[in-house]
């Protein structure tokens, strides 16, 4: 088995998180409870790639997608560990953390950070997305709803 996949599975089991391995693949499916929502997640681990994606549990209505796309683009500027993305066709919003790594053992601290970051970022920026969808806020002003963005992290 691939070190990246094996280490990820061992880490998830050690901390007691439930996951489902997609049969005959290097994909793990799980959910992570953030402060505001529970986020469906996928982890792909096959050297040299390790990718974790968390998704908002609701879709962006078609009428709001351009404004949300601008919001996500503005939010992405300066992020160090991952990025937001949106599917224009169905309104799915996700955050992705990824690394390219040799097939060698992974430290738990790295796994912890790269697995938790996508859900944490969705938690931090979801209020701005909701302000656009519910209140008609514009992207530039919606960033003020994110404490992380205001702090410049």
Predicted regions and their residues:
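Amphipathic alpha-helical segments
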Residues: 1-18
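Short glycine-/aliphatic-rich beta-strand segments at the starts of folded cytosolic domains
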Residues: 50-58
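Ser/Thr-rich, low-complexity intrinsically disordered terminal regions
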Residues: 15-39, 43-51
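A short interface-forming secondary-structure element
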Residues: 57-59, 99-104
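Short, internal acidic amphipathic alpha-helical interface segments
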Residues: 58-92
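Short, aliphatic-rich beta-strand segments
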Residues: 93-97
């Amino acid at each position: 088995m691939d070190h990246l996949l094996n280490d990820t599975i061992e880490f998830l089991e050690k901390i007691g998180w439930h996951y489902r391995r997609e049969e005959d693949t290097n994909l793990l499916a799980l959910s992570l409870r953030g402060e505001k929502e529970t986020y469906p997640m996928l982890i792909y681990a096959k050297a040299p790639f390790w990718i974790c994606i968390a998704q908002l549990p609701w879709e962006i209505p078609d009428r709001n997608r351009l404004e949300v796309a601008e919001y996500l683009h503005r939010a992405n500027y300066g992020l160090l560990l991952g990025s937001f993305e949106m599917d224009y066709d169905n309104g799915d919003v996700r955050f992705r953390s990824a690394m390219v790594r040799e097939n060698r053992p992974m430290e738990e601290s790295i796994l912890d950070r790269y697995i938790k970051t996508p859900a944490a970022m969705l938690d931090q920026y979801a209020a701005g997305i909701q302000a656009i969808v519910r209140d008609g806020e514009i992207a530039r002003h919606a960033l003020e709803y994110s404490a992380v963005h205001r702090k410049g992290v």
